[in-house]
Amino acid sequence: MNRRLLLKGALGVGLAAGVGTLGRYTVLAPPPSGRRASVDELAAELVEALSPAARARALFPYDHPLRQYYNRGLWLGGLTVSAATLDWDTRRLLTDVMYAGLSDAGRGRVPFQDSTRFMGVNMMQLAVCGDPRVGPYQLLLSGVHLNLRLGSASPEGAAFGGPQVYGDQRGNERVGLPNNTYRYQLETAQRLVAALTPAERAHVRVARAPAQVIVGVQGAAGRFDGVPVADLAPAKRALAREVVAGILGTYADDSAAYAWQCLERNGGVDALHFADYDEDFEGGRRAGDGPSQIFRLEGPAAVFHFRGEPHLHAFINVTMDGERPLGVGEVLGHNPSVLEGDALRALFETAMRAQAEADVAYYPLDAIVGRLRAGPVHTGDLWVAESWVNDLVVVEAQGADLAPGLAAAMRSRGVVPDARSRYRIATIDYIARERVRELGRIGPARKSGALRDALVAHVRSRGFELDA
């Protein structure tokens, strides 16, 4: 299911609001019961209430890489919440779990962003890593512009158990994000920018934002955009702290308090850098001399990324130790150096070609939106680096029919295409379907499994060896 279909579904749910008692047990999402209990208590009750079929879809081992994965509302896997999968009482219990993970202010935000205000928990994906009845766990709710993590901090020291993702479509393509649930965060950041001197503004403004999903902590050796908050005057530092407080204030007091502990352990908000951006990573409207709607606060152990163009996608990642980031699943190998951009694409293409037994692999640079830190690499790290959840596919083409760019890439690797030969090309389903001109005149695509599985298999067997 994609976001457009889900938004259409939200309209259908809104129209169904008049179906009366029947709707209560079928289409409509339950409101919260008003019961006040802890997330842990409610999550344990929820798991107990799931049917065997629902448990089979929703429950995962605690060390499953799904616990590390995030994006801005792509389907993560798990159970699709609906009247067909959970009865009214269980969906109400899930609604109570969601509300318990939010502050009083947050209960007026997250449940009212985007289609959630019409659908509630309906059509969200539910995944529970671990078992809240007996041990550590993480409950994940994913919907339109939402990956909400509920449960205690991870043993790895990640606040919220890992990155939080939120957003809202309102104000789409409009200056100032009018009527957006999280507009207040933008306004506070813009007040900070307005308070800067011209020289400070020049250092804060960066031409192009990083990809929104790149929020892995970098540690002390990281490179951060913008200016150190510590270098600003006290009143401006107070505004930076107000930005962070406005973001963390959405979540339950105990969860937010742990995030603040993580920040203070690493120097507080003063240890972050503040930047705003002329243009998003994916392009679009440029800020020019006007206020930007994209900002980022980042330090060795924390990232706050607010992308308000064309509408809001926002990401939070805060951890206790920037040198020991969240890593879930099997340790596959040791990465000798940071991989991003062209270097990460080289790893992807090497794995794709080897796993698909292809002559050449093609993965576009503009689709690389991840980063692999140096050091031990877990299965979850590769799931995050391959953020789009694409399938690996194989297509075939005659040498004479290869796109010029692909033929040039082959020559750069010492393979001179023969017009009369037929070549196996490993790529991703999106390219074979939507951007076929980048490949040439090709035959039908044949699936070869999930790309992330190919990456895991390659790193497990060959480490970080790359094609020449």
Describe each PLM feature range.
Residues 331-468:
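Catalytic centers of hydrolytic enzymes
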